[in-house]
Structures are given as C-alpha cells and as structure tokens.
Amino acid sequence: MAAPMDCLESLEGEGSVGRRASGVEVALPSNPGAPAPQCPHGPTLLFVKVSQGKEEPRKFYACSACRDRKDCNFFQWEDEKLSEARLAAREIHNQRCQPPLSRAQCIERYLSFIQLPLTQRKFCRSCQQLLLPADWREHGEHQLSADISTTQIARPSQLLYPLENKKTHAQYLFADRSCQFLAGLLATLGFRRVLCVGAPRLHEQIRLTAPGEKPDMRSLLLDIDFRYSQFYLEESFCRYNMFNHHFFDGKAALEVCKAFLQEEEGKGVIMVTDPPFGGLVEPLAVTFKKLIAMWKEGQSQDDSHKELPIFWIFPYFFESRICQFFPSFCMLDYQVDYDNHALYKHGKTGRKQSPVRIFTNIPPNKIILPSEEGYRFCSVCQRYVSRENQHCVHCNSCTSKDGRKWSHCFFCKKCVKPSWIHCNTCNRCALPDHSCLGPKDGCFICGSLDHKRSNCPSIGASQRANNAVRKQKQRKSNKIRREALKDNP
C-alpha cells in the first residue's frame, strides 16, 4: 500500500520535522483499562486536536482505518455517555457494514469455484466477485470476465480493482520488479514463512514460486480488503486492521496468525508490512509490537532475547519516527516501486524517484542490493547504497536519503539536500525561497530542538498553566454574566 504523490509534500513535512503545530494526534485514554468503542472497522482510536502546539481539552474516538468521515463517520467524545438504545443501534450499524458473505461462505464458494470447468468460471467486475453458476442471472447486466484461469485466481491483485481512495485504503501495489526482488531476498536470507501485513502482491509472488527454484516459503496475508477472502483458505488469509490489531473474524483468525508466527518455536519467520503512507506511525508501531509479542510467546527461553525480523516498507522521511519506536531499525537504500502509480516507478531520476524504502532490524551488511540497478557496497558503512549516495568523510556516513547526492554544510555540521542552501538568518539549511520564520521542528512548548511537544518534560506545567488560564477566563465570564443579571432583573 502507498499514498498518492499529491500527498507527498505534506507527508514529507510530517515525517521530517515531526508533529506539526496543528493537526490531530493519537492520545492516551484517561482510563487505559476501558475498552474503546467499536466502529465497523474494529476498536476506534482516541484522538486529540492540537492547535499551535496546544491540545484542545476534549479528546474524541474516531475510526482507526479511515481518515475521511465520508468513509466512516464514527465520532464520540471520550467523556460522552451513550444510552442503551444508541449502543444497540451502533451494534446493528456495525453488523450491517460487514461484507455480505461470511468467511466460511467465501471458503465454500472458493472450493466450488475451482472445481468448475474453465468455461463456467466467471468474475463480476462490477461487484468484484467470483461467480458460481447460480449467480449468473443476478449479474446478467453487469460487466463480466469469463474463462478465469487458475493463474488469474492465484493473482487476485491483478483481477481486483485497486482501492484507490487515498484517505482510506490508498492501495498501490508492488511492481513486479520490487516484488521479485523482495521474494528472492527473503529466500536468500533463509526465511521459510512470511507474514505479509498489507502486502497482497508479495503474498501472491511467494505462493507462485515454482517448487525447486528456491527453498519453499509459505505466506499468510493480513489485509483489511475483504475481497481477498474469496480467493484464499483460512490458513492463507485473515481480514485484519493493522491500525488497531483487529481480526475481523475473531479468535479463529487470531489463532491462525498465532500458529503461523509460533511454528517451529518462531524460527524462520519474517514480517513484511506495507502500510498506507497516510497512516499514523504510532498506532502502527503499537500493532506491530503486539504481533512481536505474539511471536515471542512461542519461543524457547534460550531465544527470548531475539527479535522478530521485520521489513517495514515506508517513505524515507518517516525514518526518525520509525526509529523512535524501533531503535534497532535501519533504513536501506533500496527504492520500492509500485505498479499502479505513475510516479513511484523504477527508472525515474532526481526528485521524482520513489521515496519508499525498507526499514529493518536485520543487519544491513546481510542484505545484498542488485548491482544491475546501480547499488554498490560501501566498505566503511558496511551496507549497500545507491549510485549517487556518496560517502561523506565529515559525517563518516553515506548520508543521502532520497537517491540524490547530498552536500555537506559545515555550518550545520551535516549533509543536506542539493537544493538547500544555508540561511544565516535561520541558522539552518533550507530551500532558497523559504520564509525566514525559524525552524518548524522542535518543541512547541519550551522551544527546545532536541525533542517534540509530546515528549516535553514541561508538558505537565504547560497544561496546568493552560488550565489556570481557562479557569480564570471562565470566572471572569461568570462574573460578567452575574453582573448583567443584576442590572436586568
């Protein structure tokens, strides 16, 4: 999954400078033990609006998966009390929003479909559904594809329309080049099982690998797109929301995932995840840590110190945010490309290269990147880097993040993008036409540049001061109201 290019600049801003002065952030609930209310996509997340670095007093619950209320309009204040009637109505609504077919029904239909002769295998493009002969009359006026081959059934991502709603799914799929590289790399590293979280095309590639070509690998796909339910048996697919660790088919699906991770005492498994770029890093990190904990439950005591190998595929400008939650992660130079995105494709140069990278806790010197694509090994950094990523003797590192050659700034004491120049007014490097209003990064509470607002040690004092100001204004307002009532009995 990926985000569209028109969101790239705003995403880069979010990733590179941390949280903005204004926006919406995930918040901690006042009562951590209380379950969050549920929307059709599972447990909701608690959010808080932030304006100029200050949190608004009331927090609210909203959908974890949908960033646009047109897709999921759930909204509830944290302190809001709902009647039994409203809770019952919400439960009915959540049930109505679920797919028309249960997981068991999808499996039954799939087993029937693959037994049909080729001439009777039809797919409704209008409804995005495999059709049995009994369904033909109902879909007679729809756009149909006939003679669905076994190969097509094995590649549902090419049969289904991508869900390109950029605020909900942003479903952009790996290009064959990147997909084949990833599958080959996983096999070279010796993995036997791959947990694909939001990576349907990699899941397909692994399952399509011909026996004998390389060591056999198995894959389990976790994805929120219910349409994949009709193409896989229960041991190959679980409908899953990666933003809240919600298995839509309950305990049975959770046990499938658990067994997959804990097989062979957790050895030989890796998690590969490709979240929507517009998703918040914090809830993703929380979810991935729950999957890691699930994996650790199956380990022997001798292996309790080990980490679950992970490939997290995300834009390079989220590096600091990802490493904040997973300090052992490093970013590889490999540029991941997407098949159905005009700008995230191989062969582009300069600023328009794909910004998508692989973050991993596997030592980078073990990961060989393809030399035919221009990657080379830096003996000093002990990792493969892109062609233009030159080693800086001052930083003692290959510093480029975006595939271009970066320049060292002796004032900032670090390498910066080639389009940036040093501004003496701001005392930092920036674009030539920037506004000299000072850096946007740093803490909006105390002004320090070494942490963000959410980690500020003064946040408690700041909140107390804000509360005191609000109370003072409220007392003044009440006093004016009382005086007005006296004057107008």
UniProtKB/Swiss-Prot annotation:
Binding site for Zn(2+) 6: C423, C426, H434, C436
Positions contributing to Zn(2+) 5 binding: C409, C412, H422, C429
Domain DHHC residues, every copy: 393-443
EC number annotated for this UniProt entry: 2.1.1.-
List of residues binding Zn(2+) 2: C124, C127, H139, H142
Binding-site residues, Zn(2+) 1: C39, H41, C63, C72
Amino-acid positions noted as binding Zn(2+) 4 in the UniProt annotation, renumbered to this chain: C392, C395, H408, C415
ZnF CCHC-type: positions: 441-458
One GO CC annotation: nucleolus
Oligomer status and interactors: Interacts with components of the ASC-1 complex TRIP4, ASCC1, ASCC2 and ASCC3. Interact with AHCYL1 and AHCYL2. Interact with YTHDC2.
Protein task: rRNA N6-methyltransferase that specifically methylates the adenine in position 4220 of 28S rRNA. N6-methylation of adenine(4220) in 28S rRNA is required for translation.
Protein name as catalogued: rRNA N(6)-adenosine-methyltransferase ZCCHC4
Encoding gene (name): Zcchc4
